[in-house]
Design a protein with these regions (language model features):
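Hydrophobic "anchor" residues
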Residues: 17-19, 146, 336
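A broadly structural signal marking compact, well-ordered functional cores
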Residues: 1, 12, 52, 65-70, ...
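Unchanged
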Residues: 38-64, 71-128, 147-153
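Non-transmembrane, aqueous-exposed alpha-helical and coiled segments at domain scale
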Residues: 155-514
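Short acidic-hydrophobic surface loop/beta-edge motif
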Residues: 67-69, 73, 138-139, 197-202
């Protein structure tokens, strides 16, 4: 869905507010602020000043941005999304005048004519008149009824996606879905080459990445790799080449302090590590970065010598913190693999995988976070005890849960085929375990997710496969969801029922409507 960027300005003097009565078109008979479309190569501030002068004959000289509104609405029978930069002006040159579009009127702020305004105005206008800066989203039906609304602090524009178990819960699918449905302006990650992320579009195309954010599937989302990333350049180059059609004209912004993996890091891990590992050199590279060794290579050094026209070195923290639009932070691996709070050390990964760590690696504040999506599956997994270099290791158990077979999972679900899963990076068969409710509650305690996403619902009952309607989900799946919510006190808002992007049931508007 394309986004139409607009501005809206309200003139305020002491306890009075200027609203303009529309004379024709979309605004006819409605009171509103004044504004309109942002032209190409025009900033929101420039567009706001221009439109106020055009529509009521004054030029704002002292003003501030107080909000960012998004609307999904119908226009000429088609759904469209409006993104509106909201301003209040306290000083201006000239006197408000009637034009061919509007008739300006002054109101006391306590007498705002909400009955003659758009239905959403009554929700957000009182807040900004009290001095609050807000972000809001409204979903309208064809009759201009508000179906769903979400209003929150303007500075809370960050959503985080984490894995609530030991990885392979379908983060790639959910990040791709969210990036398109929720229209994120920027997506960032701290990934390394020891984990892969998969997304399957509706045409069956499989996108698999270890470095590029999965938000590449949205052509309007800026993508960046932050300072917490540990990069294998060959893999990044391969992904840029393979998905050049998805990237289009976009750059991939990389923080100068992202770490680069060298062959010595892979060699060291193959010679030294005896616990579960992909032997991609990620842990060894991170250790060298922590020790500030002289022979390390950071992204700023590597990419200044090895040119790729798609990569641009940039302070991604500045990029993210200067963005007022929605930001998606894509996590990797899983909380059960966290080096400090994961399962059985040393059968963990080389760093923390919590929401707090992912946010810190992005260079963002926790106070900017609005949502944390924790992705889980009904049967958690661990990697194979057989490595991709021929070694047999102990990849760990699952907090005492019984290890079962993929045949047993299929039997319980009523599926006659084979559910066997293989890891994206090493191509080894995953081990599968019974759900551990105590472990899930522990991971919820660590991360405090606002929402839980349940993927692989078809593993509970195969009749859920490809289901897109909650009402049609088998009772067995609904009962499982109910137990998740009872055990964690966190709503299950998204349900994955298959591999493809369309195999999703999104309950957010139902469960989170405020």
């Amino acid at each position: 869905m394309a986004i139409l960027e607009q501005t809206l300005c309200l003139l305020k003097k002491d306890s009075k507010l200027l609203l303009a009565l529309g004379k024709k078109g979309f605004n006819a008979g409605k009171y509103n602020g004044v504004g309109g479309k942002i032209r190409k190569n025009e900033t929101p501030d420039q567009a706001m000043v221009r439109k106020v002068k055009e529509e009521i004959g004054v030029t704002p000289t002292s003003y501030g941005k107080v909000g960012y509104l998004e609307f999904d609405e119908y226009y000429e029978g088609e759904k469209r999304r409006i993104a509106m930069h909201l301003y209040i002006a306290s000083e201006w040159d000239g006197d408000p005048m009637e034009t061919n579009m509007f008739i300006p009127h002054w109101f006391h702020i306590s007498d705002s004519p909400y009955e003659k305004m758009f239905p959403d105005d009554k929700y957000w206008l009182p807040l900004i008149l009290k001095g609050k800066k807000i972000r809001a989203y409204f979903d309208y039906d064809k009759d201009w009824n508000v179906l769903y609304k979400d209003i929150y602090n303007m500075n809370q524009n960050v959503s985080v996606v984490i894995d609530g178990q030991a990885g392979s819960c379908g983060k790639g699918k959910i990040c791709g879905y969210l990036s398109q449905i929720d229209q994120y302006k920027i997506s960032t990650n701290n990934w390394s080459s020891n984990a892969g992320h998969t997304y399957v579009d509706n045409k069956g195309r499989k996108i698999v990445v270890s470095h590029l954010p999965m938000a590449i599937v949205n052509p309007d989302t800026i993508v960046c790799i932050n300072a917490g990333a540990i990069i294998t350049p060959e893999i990044l180059f391969k992904e840029i080449k393979e998905y050049k059609d998805l990237l289009g004209k976009r750059k991939v912004y990389v923080h100068p302090r992202a770490m680069v993996i060298q062959q010595k890091h892979r060699d060291y891990e193959m010679a030294s590590i005896r616990s579960g590992s992909t032997f991609k050199g990620c842990g060894a590279a991170l250790a060298d970065k922590i020790m500030r060794k002289k022979d390390i290579i950071l992204a700023k050094d590597y990419f200044s010598n090895v040119h790729n026209s798609k990569i641009e070195i940039m302070d991604t923290a500045m990029l993210l913190n200067n963005e007022i639009g929605k930001i998606l932070v894509e996590g990797a691996q899983g909380q059960d693999l966290d080096i400090n709070y994961g399962l059985d050390y040393p059968n963990v990964t080389s760093r923390m995988c919590s929401a707090a760590q992912i946010i810190a690696d992005a260079g963002l504040s926790v106070f900017g976070v609005k949502d944390i999506y924790m992705i889980i599956r009904p049967y958690p997994i661990r990697i194979s005890n057989e490595t991709n270099i021929g070694k047999t290791i102990n990849s760990g158990d699952y907090a005492g849960s019984q290890e079962i077979t993929w045949e047993e999972v299929a039997k319980r679900s009523g599926f006659k085929g084979n559910f066997e899963e293989y890891t994206t990076v090493t191509k080894k068969k995953r081990r599968v375990f019974e759900m551990n409710w105590d472990r899930l509650k522990y991971n919820v305690m660590i991360n405090k997710p606002t929402q839980i996403v349940l993927n692989f619902a078809q593993y509970i009952d195969y009749r859920a496969y490809n289901c897109k309607d909650y009402a049609k989900l088998p009772k067995k799946v609904k009962d499982f969801i109910k137990r998740i919510e009872e055990e964690t006190s966190v709503p299950v808002t998204i349900i994955g029922t298959g591999e493809n992007e369309e195999d999703i049931i999104d309950l957010r508007k139902l469960k989170l409507n405020t």
